[in-house]
Amino acid sequence: MSKDLLLEIGTEEIPAHYMPSALKQLHEGAADIFAKNHLDYKDIRTVGTPRRLALLVTGLAEKQADVSSKNKGPSVKIAFDADGNPTQAAMGFARGQHIDVSELVTEDGYVYVDVTVAGSETKALLPEIMKKLVSSLAFPKSMTWGNEDMRFVRPLRWFVALFGTEVVPFEMAHVVSGRTTRGHRFLGTGDFDIQAPGEYVDLLREHYIIVDPEERRDMIVNGLHAVAKKQGGHVVMDEELLEEVVYLVEYPTPLYGCFDTDYLELPEAAVITPMKDHQRYFPLRDSEDRLMNMFLTVRNGDDYHLDTVRHGNERVLRARLDDAKFFFAEDRKKSLADRTEDLKRIVFQDGLGTLFDKSQRLAAIMTFLTAKLDLPVEEGEIKHLADLAKTDLLTQMVQEFTELQGVMGREYALLDGEEPETAEAVFEQYLPRFAGDELPHTTLGLLLSLADKFDTITGSFSLGLIPTGSQDPFALRRQTIGVLNILIDAGWNINCDEVFAYILEVLGTDRNKREDVIASLHDYFVLRLKNILQDAGFDYHIIDCVLQGDSMNAAEIVKRATALRDSEFSTQEELLQAYTRVANMVKDAQNTDVDDTLFETEEEKALYAACLAAEAELPQAYAVYDYRCAVEILGRAVSAINNFLDNVLVMHEKEAVKNNRMNLLTRTLGLISPVGDIKKLS
């Protein structure tokens, strides 16, 4: 027998960006706690609005499943005497298990008792389960309220807890569970009761609460498209903004608004950013993809008095756009190049100087990278780009709308008559800005982005500002992942440790500290690269194999991992198995001197010939980081390796022959060592 379960946690408005995680936690927490309590169910669903988090469970068993187990006792020798009679040990064990000694069973030389624990009634367990689910929810920030000691994201106002038609009684923060919920703040008719979980979603809809986020999303998307079409345009659908709006409203109604066409003379970013990031409005474009002097927004309510709402939204946006127009006009009075000296007034970071100091370091780091990578970039280009890189941070537009850093830098650079690639690089230095964002694609943009991130990361580590746990105030994790993804995508082969060392020299870091700082940076980058490889689906054996070694060359490491994964040999078979067998034989042996006059078998000769052939071809493949070719060459020796190990006794009675065979294997293992530590595949 089973019943449906409902838990609704009623609160003050929860921040929109907390909601997806909270609903996911509630879903996973319920599944976990039901499993631990041996409670079967058909389905779990979580829904919610800014004022409520709800758990809906269908087919929850009315009783725990019985749990059977075997409790192990003393050995048979101790439990029974020579005549098979139970000893004091057996009787004591039986007594402790609350059974007669005759019920003991023997298995594997020990006595056991079969124990079955009858399941409890679900309704008796649910009050505690409900409280655990509520208290288990974690948020980036929480609060206390009134005289309560309990912390939660926002004050708790009501609980609905139903198992079937019965209320699950519990109390938290002086809020007692019941069946009464609340409708829309303005459209609803007050509190109302839920009689059973199955009516929850539909009954809330009648009171102007669209509790299912997916239903709200569909209403918003369809409504926005319909309004946009009616106004002769199409909506610029931003998924991040859409997700936020879904969790800002309980009953969505899309509407449009207008603004003066004069504002369209501003750079698009200066119009869209105040609209989207500050007002949560969606821009509109016409059939030729030009920005229109219109916007779409979503009201938390019905279509009553929409004109009044529209005018209010237009008035707020007009003030924002007036500010943007003023900032733009003021900024255009001075070129970016004329702002370079002003960078000396702005501290970049305590201990790392001003933005001017940073721009000087950027020039030095870009020059270093250019030389290492042998790129066709003039030193004058680098110096000029470094001078411009941070100057847009001094503009009023960026100081007001900080998310426009780089974006307005590109716009202003183009208006100043800078080369397009230089302007693009000013923008690209901040890429990627988030997971999945685009990467720089111009040479100057790649150099500046890497230099900027390398400088910030290395400088922070030199000051001991290393991310720990959830604390990462300077976004070093994101920047590290950005560096690695840029290097991998560009295929630029450079040892990051060398970059760290150079930057520490430029910073003037104490020489006695540098080695430790580089080691910390190396380990930090290795861990981030490991995560990237895992996310890309690489087998953990391959990851461990290629991450061994002193060099932190991300592009080269990924090439090695890809070559191992994509070779015609299976990860667990042939090539890797063959070389792993060699590694297990060699262990820590170092000598690779082979005397072919000591060979006694054809297998030795064949392996030596295969080894020489590979040694002739591999250096060229390794020199150009062509690991696909290298793996193919290594594969040609597999047959000879297996024949040798299957048919030749390495530990020969003659010391010279034994050592020579071991040296041959050591030399064979050396063929694959540039690819990775094959012992990690054991």
Question: Locations of the language-model features?
Answer:
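Amphipathic alpha-helical "coupling" segments that flank catalytic cores
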Residues: M1-S682
